């Protein structure tokens, strides 16, 4: 994988993680929020941009697409969900990647007193 491609994938993941896609337990619709549907539409657009085929969003909020391979081999699938648990605050999230993570504590730039420690998990 080239460094440019790796950077693009990393930036895409960070952008997805920053989207407020919190579920609404009281909703009778699927997806349960407009933000979740917006994320599905973003994924649909990005799949079109990379020339994926057979793109569709199902009534259950699932994006399906085919990305043809560049050589013969087994078919693979990628699965993920777009919702965030309702117990989690999904607003104003500032995701980041820590390259070369050493397994120690992680501090948060906006609140250095907030620490994520492997000892707590």
Show which residues each predicted segment covers:
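Alpha-helical interaction segments
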Residues: 5-6, 111
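Secondary-structure transition/capping residues
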Residues: 23-24, 54, 89
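Active-site metal-coordination/substrate-binding segment of hydrolases
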Residues: 74-121
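Charged, compositionally biased N-terminal leader segments and the immediate start
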Residues: 1-2
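A non-catalytic alpha/beta surface segment that caps or lines the substrate-entry region
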Residues: 28-83, 93, 98
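N-terminal capping segment at the start of a domain
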Residues: 6-34
């Amino acid at each position: 994988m080239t460094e440019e491609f790796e950077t693009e994938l990393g930036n895409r993941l960070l952008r997805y993680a920053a989207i407020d896609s919190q579920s609404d337990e009281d909703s009778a619709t699927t997806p349960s929020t407009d933000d979740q549907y917006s994320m599905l539409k973003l994924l649909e657009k990005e799949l079109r941009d990379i020339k994926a085929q057979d793109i569709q969003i199902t009534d259950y909020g699932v994006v399906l697409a085919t990305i043809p391979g560049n050589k013969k081999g087994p078919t693979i699938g990628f699965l993920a969900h777009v919702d965030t648990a309702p117990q989690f605050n999904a607003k104003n999230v500032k995701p980041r990647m820590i390259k070369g993570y050493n397994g120690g504590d992680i501090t948060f730039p906006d609140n250095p007193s907030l620490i994520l420690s492997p000892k707590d998990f």
